[in-house]
Amino acid sequence: MNCLCCGKPLRTPDETGWHKACIKRFFGTTKLPEIEIDDKTLNLLATETTNKGFTVPGVQKKLSLHLVSDSRKPRLTLVNYPTGYILKPQVAEFEALPESEQLIMTMADMAGISTVPHALIKGNAGLAYITKRVDRNLTSDKVEMLAMEDFCQLDLRLTEDKYSCLLYTSPSPR
C-alpha cells in the first residue's frame, strides 16, 4: 500500500495509511487525526453547508474543519474556529471524486505547479480528499483572509459567473 499523503510505499502495514513524517508535516501531530463525525452526518452537513453558503465556495460537497491537536488523540472537528482544513467526502453522483482530485493535484505537483498541501484520508465510506487552507493567516488574536485565485479565472470569468462554467453557459458581458 502507498501513503495516502505522499503516494510513496509504506514500509510497514499501517492502519492509518500515512507515513509518520507525512502526518507530522501535514497536521503537525504525531498521530493521524480522527474525523469526529460519521459519514452519513458528514455528507448531510456538507450538502447543507454548501447549499447555504457557509463553506468554501464550489459545487463539490465540502466541509471546513478545525484540528483539535490533543497529543493523545488529535481529531478533526466542525466546532471551533479558525478552520484549518477542507474535507471533500465521497459523493454518490461521481465515483472516486476524492481520488481523482488527489491524482490531479499530484500531477500538478509533479509538473512543478505550486499547490496547497493535499492528501487522502480514510473515512467510514471510503477515502475523502483533505487539503490545508492557505487562504488565511492565523494569529492568536485574528484571522486575516487572503485573496486566492482559482481555475475559473483562467477562463476570464467574473466571480458571479464562477459556476456558470459548469452549466456550459456564456459568462456575463464585461
Where are these regions (language model features)?
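Regulatory N- and C-terminal appendages and interdomain linkers associated
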Residues: 1-32
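Conserved ATP-binding subdomain of kinase catalytic cores across diverse folds
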Residues: 48-159
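Conserved small/polar residues in nucleotide/adenosyl-binding loops
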Residues: 168-174
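Short low-complexity stretches enriched in small and charged residues
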Residues: 14-23, 38-47, 84-89
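A short mid-domain helix/strand-loop element embedded in enzyme catalytic domains
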Residues: 158-167
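N-terminal charged segments
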Residues: 30-49, 55-56
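Short, compositionally biased low-complexity segments
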Residues: 5-7, 14, 36, 74-82
